Amino acid sequence: FIKSLIRIQGIALILLIGIFSILFYLSGKELWIFDFMGHYIPNVFSEVTGGREQGFFLVQRLYIFLVGLSLCTLSVANMERLPNWNYCHRKMYVAGGIFGGLALLAVIGVFCSFHENIKTRSFYSACQEKYEKTPEVRVVSHDIELRRAGDSLYMKSHLVLVNEGKYPCSTFTFYLNPGLRVDSLWEGCQQVAFLREGQILSIDRRLCAGDSVSLQLEYSGKIDERICYLDVADDVYSSFKVFPGGLPYRFARCYAYVGDDFMLLTPESIWYPVTSPPVVTSRDVVMRGMYFTRYTLRVVGEKDRVVISQGKCLREKDSRLFDAGHALPALSVCMGNYERKYLKDAGTLYEIYCFKGHD
């Protein structure tokens, strides 16, 4: 295309070298739009979770293909032809313009998707900073019931909260993944009103110093990964992890996963309600002390999968109950097609779980 525009071969060659140098420099700088070789986009496929960010990968490669097709078509249109073939020139220009327009739409789609994620994370950070100075109450015990259907979660929580401060509080807050909708909130037989803003669940309920309250929550929905690690800079969050050893492979970041074959939920995704955020986003707020809670987790279903969580597992008819027997700072759960291998030595049980065929 450059050679068809600039008839002098030497100048065209120098210009091409300059363009390629600029493209190599800009690769990975801004949403990998200029990464024509695909070195800076996620290209690793997992047998467990599949290909993360597959949509972005396909759109980016489609954009590069359309740009190349547009330039090839326009270069043909610029070639000198016989006078009675002028109509062919117009067709090539139209085709090149269409391919270029489609490539532009693909770029706009990538930009909108990335900037929407950054905008959403900024909203979550603003919500947290707004409520970070609200007096905290401690969750003494928390009984969780989890049921999964596809990539959706249906959960129940029974919490006992205590105001361990010296002063009464008129309002306290919960943090819960914004992708999970609160279906009901009860205190005994009385329904409790609440205000939901992003990941914040604000409850107007007076709690005197030393008093406790028991609440029951029902919530459901899909996990929103954008709530994880709000203290991480946007450019780091949008980047992809490099494969160890300097190999040209990139991992897509995945902070939570819910599916039929695999599930991983960590405290950073706030998959159950807590009164203390996992990270602090404001410089004016000092990270508060770590609270320990007596957790129990009941996972309903998942008969054909191995479920892993903290505590001793008690199998029941259609569920599994995990109880550590002591207070924990947080709770995680993992489910998959695992094989369990264990060794008992001097009264101590050592366990390791690995995917079948990957040990």
Task: Mark where each language-model region is.
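A surface-exposed beta-strand-loop module
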Residues: 168-169, 177-238, 284
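Extended, low-hydrophobicity, Ser/Thr/Pro/Gly-biased non-transmembrane segments
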Residues: 218-330
